[in-house]
């Protein structure tokens, strides 16, 4: 029921810290071979949110898996979770590398903490960028210059209600531009993750269809943000099968 969820306002902590929860219409893994700053890529693409991507080496080459529309830019021996984007454009935390894919350090899955072996430079307390998924499907972006360990970041994301999460590059690479603020860095990064927030028009189109097709009742349409019970979900799925 992602399409009927309303946007959560950006949560602004001290300067250099941004968190935003929103319904995502589509996302894109961006390979920054021309070393453009995030602000320029945001202007050129029209995305609503943009954050730095995953780790890279001294030659400005991504490490881990970077796949753009089926073309492998970089790879490693691991087949762990990452940001996976299929034909529908929706970002998910999966292992599927068939469409577009970007590696990340798995932090949470179904609300449980995940542990992975980290090199000292990644394990140390540092500024952090992360992508999370709420139980209702909305995206939670975390971009914070405050130094945090992995466990501290996990606890903060759990406190926001995040179910699944991946940690991206951090330290001096941490940067992001959101609709109501930014976390800036002068460092160029080879990969970025772009998001387009679902518009009110898109949400209303989904609701209008749901009402006309009888998937949602008038009562449910009056409060589309209300949590759907298991019984109501079963009724909706049953109607779809008819």
Q: Where in the sequence are the language-model features?
A:
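Gly/Ser/Thr/Pro-rich low-complexity, intrinsically disordered segments
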Residues: 1-201
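Short, solvent-exposed alpha-helical surface patches in non-cytosolic proteins
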Residues: 202-215, 219-242
